[in-house]
Amino acid sequence: MEKQDLEKIESDIINDWTEADDLDDALDFLFMEKVSEFKIKFKDPLKVTEEEYRELLGNYDSSNSVSSNGITIDQYTYDEDDDIMYKLEFTYRKEDNKIYIYEVQGWREKKK
């Protein structure tokens, strides 16, 4: 992938990822390459355990959550440096001690 392609990434619907490790590898890549914005949607929700979900989140600095009709949106903030913060937003439902992830978005913002 070319560097100029990394400024903004919006995926096609992804339907071949079946494990949390696939998403974890993608998130690591996006963080390391300092992608300014991305969105990943799943045709079939990615099923993860609560432990795998926590591992995907890593060490965040703050969080916010809202739920409606069984769907939850969690937003996590990570301090990147003095001027920039990184945000991750997960849209999912929880059922039978599993988390079904529909979408993940990430973006960088200047701190206010």
Swiss-Prot record:
Protein name listed in UniProt: Uncharacterized protein 14
Organism placement in taxonomy: Viruses, Adnaviria, Zilligvirae, Taleaviricota, Tokiviricetes
Pfam families xrefs: DUF1374
Domain of life: Viruses
InterPro entries the UniProt entry points to: SIFV_Orf14
Annotated source species: Sulfolobus islandicus filamentous virus (isolate Iceland/Hveragerdi) (SIFV)
NCBIfam families cross-referenced by the UniProt entry: AcrID1_fam
